[in-house]
Amino acid sequence: MAAQADDELNKLRLNGQNGEAKEQVSASAVDTADNDDSEDDEKEEEGGAEVAATEAAKKKKKRKPKKKKKGGAKKQSSPPRVPVSELFPNNQYPEGEIVEYKDENNYRTTNEEKRYLDRMNNDFLQEYRQGAEVHRQVRQYAQKNIKPGQTLTEIAEGIEDAVRALTGHQGLEEGDNIKGGMGFPCGLSINHCAAHYTPNAGNKMVLQQGDVMKVDFGAHINGRIVDSAFTMTFDPVYDNLLTAVKEATNTGIREAGIDVRMSDIGAAIQEVMESYEVEINGTTYPVKAIRNLNGHNIDQHVIHGGKSVPIVKGGDQTKMEEGEVFAIETFGSTGKGYVREDMETSHYAKAQDAPNVSLRLSSAKNLLNVINKNFGTLPFCRRYLDRLGQDKYLLGLNNLVSAGIVQDYPPLCDIKGSYTAQYEHTIVLRPTVKEVISRGDDY
């Protein structure tokens, strides 16, 4: 409408100028009877000026304003391939959900000091928010497009390729994956398997209509890992199981805060989780919190920072502290509520406190060099080594595990025939509020 309104104004101006020109020409015609030749020349000059003014007005009318070039992409592609830095060229990413602390400790610092500390942490927060935006956009696509009949390899690689594209780090050059990309391998744990399962090369497993699949993946910018997970099902019979776990995770987020004891969070989570039950094939199962799985704090380039957030009552009296980052995750099961290591290992990470030992196997030495340059202390899986062109590395990898340099993380499973679910968010304990970095419209 604005362009149309400008045209109408130009027409009115042009008509006004033409009208004035006609009146002036008529007046000049009356005066010519008594005027000499020099006056005729002046009339012609005035008429020429009026015509020139009219022509200029016409040209002005025709001249269209130049359209400003739009900088950067305005929306995400499908599948996601546009780096989020192009969607947010000012590098200001959306805040997560802001949650007030339940019982603010006024003695800690003044409100003004807290606000100052928040401003000082801006770069730190922007890196987390960028990773969170990557996670939200990738999982939005995944939730819409993952269907029964797809292989787990296809699903995992689709998610991982999207994360690498949106962070702008493909991870194929030395050091690139340490700057940004996958925070840890995409976990796709099915049914009784609760965590740490991703397909190795050659895996032919296919997602089935009746499966309960936990999708757990991380995106990082400069080692700021956003760890978030959700559960996918294709049968409403599992709805209560998913609701129980989702509500338990939200309870953990609500209870978390500066100076809060881990044990208190675990008790609140368990109370909510185990208030649910689910009916499957005519049998009613109580939903049990998996007592030997926990949430955890996150350090830079380190997914498990040393503190654990239990999901059952009792135990750890450790407190959360200001400035810490936590992955609040809960797991519910229709089985025993206890997991054991099972199936083929796929997840690995170099130990933070890796011992300086002499390695005899050249394959182990070479592989450690690859791990140091491409992952550091970030978790990786066998497919990532394949992607970097490594082959015949299993002997060397097992040697690094035996030496305590690399930690293996086998899949964790409840009893066969049971179903498990997971929901997880990353939160930052800011001085003034807690920010649920990974929160989205989906969960």
Curated annotation (Swiss-Prot):
GO terms classed as biological process: proteolysis
Any one GO molecular-function label of the UniProt entry: metalloaminopeptidase activity
Superkingdom of source: Eukaryota
Subcellular location: Cytoplasm
Cofactor section: Co(2+); Zn(2+); Mn(2+); Fe(2+)
Annotated region (Disordered), positions in chain: 1-90
Family according to the record: Belongs to the peptidase M24A family. Methionine aminopeptidase eukaryotic type 2 subfamily.
Protein's UniProt name: Methionine aminopeptidase 2-1
Organism this protein belongs to: Talaromyces stipitatus (strain ATCC 10500 / CBS 375.48 / QM 6759 / NRRL 1006)
